[in-house]
Amino acid sequence: MTNNYINSPLDQFIINNLLEINSPFLNLSTLNFSTFSLYTLFVVLVISLTFILSIGGESNNLVKGSNWLIAIEAIFDTILNMVKGQIGGSVYGRYVPLVYTLFTFILVANLIGMVPYNFALSASLIYIIGISVSLWIGLTILGLFLNKAVFFSLFVPSGTPLPLVPVLVLIELLSYTARAISLGLRLAANTLSGHLLMSILGNLVKNLMSINYFTFIFGLIPLAGIFAIVILEFAIACIQAYVFAILTSSYLKDSIYLH
């Protein structure tokens, strides 16, 4: 009998405790070091190493810089132009670091999750929705700080007839609150579905190719399709990080300008 590394397509999303901290006096279960913590730390280390390589590259030319530095500057310039186009005005620059950090973190987490048998951080609903809810709370506080009570005019579209105000306020409030969930849910759903698709198709092709020589040769056709899906998933990993950054910039604009 053949032993599989993964018995179920969902096994790759299970959070396992790697180091447990127990105390007879205090509940320290939340301080356990799990795969969740390990991969979060790994993502941060990869981002830090990337910046170190960009600074200490082979080239000492201060104008040209290393290849790592050129790549990072290209990404930063893309995010800068995107935030400038979304927010505009003279205040957009102060929010570029936030959007760039979110984009970089999600991009690296998505790419690390593409490695076979890895834990996908962005496929964890609790993790990603936790980020989106925290971001939504922060943007709401920012809107209240900048606009005071005028912030609540965001829930009343201009020109609304007085009898329709209660209904529209409820609709706008629900729409605004849904951002806290939809921002992270979109990313997690795309990542989860992509990983499940690759895992299920990979197991099916493996079982097909292990029957006999004929099915092994025939299985090369769907195997090529799986390689195409993997390439597509890499593209989706980059696109989803960019979409998250765009939506964050759009929500920032609403908090600043109330429209």
Swiss-Prot record:
SUPFAM superfamilies in alphabetical order: F1F0 ATP synthase subunit A (SSF81336)
Localization, UniProt: Mitochondrion inner membrane
Lipid bilayer topology: Multi-pass membrane protein
Free-text function comment from the UniProt entry: Mitochondrial membrane ATP synthase (F(1)F(0) ATP synthase or Complex V) produces ATP from ADP in the presence of a proton gradient across the membrane which is generated by electron transport complexes of the respiratory chain. F-type ATP synthases consist of two structural domains, F(1) - containing the extramembraneous catalytic core, and F(0) - containing the membrane proton channel, linked together by a central stalk and a peripheral stalk.
PANTHER family with a match to the protein in the record: ATP SYNTHASE SUBUNIT A (PTHR11410:SF0)
InterPro entries for the chain: ATP_synth_F0_asu, ATP_synth_F0_asu_AS, ATP_synth_F0_asu_bact/mt, F0_ATP_A_sf
Gene from which this protein is expressed: ATP6
Keyword Lipid biosynthesis: no
Name of the protein described by the UniProt record: ATP synthase subunit a
Residue ranges annotated as propeptide in the record: 1-7
Keyword Transmembrane helix: yes
Keywords noted in UniProt: ATP synthesis, CF(0), Hydrogen ion transport, Ion transport, Membrane, Mitochondrion, Mitochondrion inner membrane, Transmembrane, Transmembrane helix, Transport
